[in-house]
């Protein structure tokens, strides 16, 4: 699968298979193509060549209906917390306000229903994004550096939710620069560099015995050129 933006190849003939009910960390230096990797799965970026298959489905709309994505920078409406929840609910299978409230409670936003989303802290905004993603009960959850620069409470809550959703059968793919987080959460790792998949293996193997020099340098905190 290849993705080209302008004249630049962002993903270069990548070929990988993500196991159902796994938690896959997509790792790599800045500019490796991690975010575009997730956006391609989410249908936000056009594929130049190749194809994407999810549970035997190849139709982009069908695939997108099976998933939800949480971005590093929350994308919220300038409305109340509950209005943000209702907006997503109305786009898909409409859910009761009680169910939406239960999801807010789940992410630690109980009592915030009428608070304007713009007045939330960074961590609260990301937790609201998480609650909105769970509205559609997705089979696949995509997270693009979901805990970057968050307070410890929000970070721990989101990590716990990732593990909880995975425990009930959800497949999770996330990007991160936090090696400790990748070790805590991931069952599998995809390592990207310059738009190519250099390694795909189970997490423990990747961190104990990386096969490529690029992966070794990345794990050791060295700059890749």
Residue ranges and their predicted role:
Residues 116-120, 124:
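Conserved ABC ATPase signature
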Residues 42:
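Helix-to-loop junction immediately C-terminal to a conserved catalytic motif
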Residues 182-184:
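A short, surface-exposed alpha-helical micro-motif characterized by mixed small hydrophobic
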Residues 27-29:
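The feature captures the beta-strand-to-loop junction immediately N-terminal to the Walker
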Residues 176-177:
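H-loop/switch region of ABC-family ATPase nucleotide-binding domains
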